Amino acid sequence: MVGEMPALKDLVLQLEPSVLDLDLYCYEEVPPDDIEEELVSPQQPYAVVASCAYCEKLVRLTVLADHSAIRQLEELLLRSLNIVCPLCTLQRQ
């Protein structure tokens, strides 16, 4: 643009591509969901503390699981799964 005021002749009316022959296709392969979960969440040890269903004493155990399995265990413990301590197990046999 020349001068203080823009003139019509100063405007560019042709659009030219800035990059020629740009390949926008992504050649990356995405793994299936089940493989991706294994890669993202490896099994780790978790300490679980729950009370005995009979005597209410604390029962401590360690499990090896991934994040989704721990969530499922938590749901089971909150709903229908009860843990029994070793002493109550021996007394009830």
Swiss-Prot record:
Keyword Iron-sulfur in the entry? The reply is no
Q: Per its UniProt record, what InterPro entries does this chain match?
A: Papilloma_E7 (IPR000148)
Zinc as UniProt keyword: yes
Primary localization class, coarse: host cell
ZnF unnamed residues are 52-88
Record's comment describing the protein's domains? The E7 terminal domain is an intrinsically disordered domain, whose flexibility and conformational transitions confer target adaptability to the oncoprotein. It allows adaptation to a variety of protein targets and exposes the PEST degradation sequence that regulates its turnover in the cell.
The molecule here is called: Protein E7
State the taxonomy lineage: Viruses, Monodnaviria, Shotokuvirae, Cossaviricota, Papovaviricetes
